[in-house]
């Protein structure tokens, strides 16, 4: 049985009892992407997020060295409460780890970025099928040919997540998710993936491929993995992010993020 509260979920991650993708867990609460980098680069990264708000909507920013972000949860620990972390050295993914306690530095600044998993509970309540949840897979994510707006050393390409839907469901999904810009808002594209520079939906760059049934169209949202393309391009000596699909569970309710 899934933990009922975000705090219980984080505790299960902290104990090592949960290490998988977080889609479908703690439905009424927001999940967050994570980027962690040295303070020397934090101002430029903040400007990068502000320049690319669709992909990088900020939910919280920590002080240098702080591994708690009270705005996200009272008992939250950035170092231990994500099921899996990506470690980048000089722009290359060098390892995945379950904890940052051994890597944490006094100059690290943590950025929490809204995640589209947050609005999936509302889509499901409207009867909109979420194929990756149905199939027990991670959501598929793709690099696009769309460049991000640059800020300092940070650039890279937009990453999108994809959910296949029937046309009527896609329209309803636009209506629902447009209320939540803090977790990526409305889709950026419906239909032909080639218009985004995606050649093969069966070969996602991150996550897992899912079944697209006859009569369905792919629906694409800006994705919080986008900052990882910026971190790779920037080639920082050390930077850390969540492993795609493995999010930080927050105490923020999805309802509180609605703008209308």
Swiss-Prot record:
<dbReference type="InterPro" id="IPR009906">
    <property type="entry name" value="D-Glu_cyclase"/>
</dbReference>
<comment type="similarity">
    <text>Belongs to the D-glutamate cyclase family.</text>
</comment>
<dbReference type="Pfam" id="PF07286">
    <property type="entry name" value="D-Glu_cyclase"/>
</dbReference>
<dbReference type="InterPro" id="IPR016938">
    <property type="entry name" value="UPF0317"/>
</dbReference>
<protein>
    <recommendedName>
        <fullName>Putative hydro-lyase Bmul_5125/BMULJ_03391</fullName>
        <ecNumber>4.2.1.-</ecNumber>
    </recommendedName>
</protein>
<dbReference type="GO" id="GO:0016829">
    <property type="term" value="F:lyase activity"/>
</dbReference>
<keyword id="KW-0456">Lyase</keyword>
<dbReference type="InterPro" id="IPR038021">
    <property type="entry name" value="Putative_hydro-lyase"/>
</dbReference>
